[in-house]
Amino acid sequence: MSAQDSIPYLQIRVDGICQVTPTHYTKTIQFRDINYQLSDNEDKQAIFDGWCDFLNYFDSSIKFQFSFVNLTALRESFVRAIPSRSDQFESIQRELSKIIEEQQAKGNNGIVKTKYLTFGIDADNIRSAKPRLERIETDILNNFKRLGVSAEVLNGQERLRVLHDILRMDTPEPFTFRWEDLPRSGLSTKDYIAPSSFLFNRAKDFRMGKKFASVSFLQILAPELSDRILKDFLDIESNIVVNIHVQSVDQVSAIKTIKRTITDLDKSKIEEQKKAVRAGYDMDISATRS
């Protein structure tokens, strides 16, 4: 299997729709920060309530994930974003370049933090998927606007750039993809974003080009979580991608799941009581402790 084959999508279109499987299609929206940590408690509660309403928009037919991407940007990429000037603004351009160098010298590491929401639906074909994805996209953008969050939809080239920057961290090569190059080159979109190789021969990490990486899975089962848990992850001064996968569950399925969980807990409790009796403990005491 090639490195390209290890990237799990079928095609990405110019309009930003990605066909992940024969029947699953996605789009991605980039969004900005809300200044949550510096807000007072009343504002924090209002922000929290707003996000709850935002999440409640998604029904069980829409799968979505939040992606928080922290990547070290090369100094050259910053400088490219500041075009050279030979006019009255030349001194400003030099000053900006100097600031970049000073920040990196101070150990800022040039970490660039971006945030995305990717949503997907199941459909028989692109013709039926496209209009529904566009309706969901409009709703999400309106919901972000109500939260006071700026957001924009990524087109196909922009989605490929995000993947390129993650998968090719080991190379300073710029992202040079252009749609018009595909027909005459005989290449696919994956050829522009895939690393030189993937190597999955170790238990706790893998190799992606010349970089070593590791993936951890966190299943959230706690009834309460600190509102700082995500911030603490993203404050790590290193290349890190945090994905939060969310799947809404319809009410009937949720009730069935709760009942099944209660039944499993009751069974476990009975088994523990039986073990206690066999060990010579009083079953009533064991039940009380449970």
Predicted segment positions?
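Extended, folded cores of ATP/NTP-driven motor/assembly subunits in large transport
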Residues: M1-S290
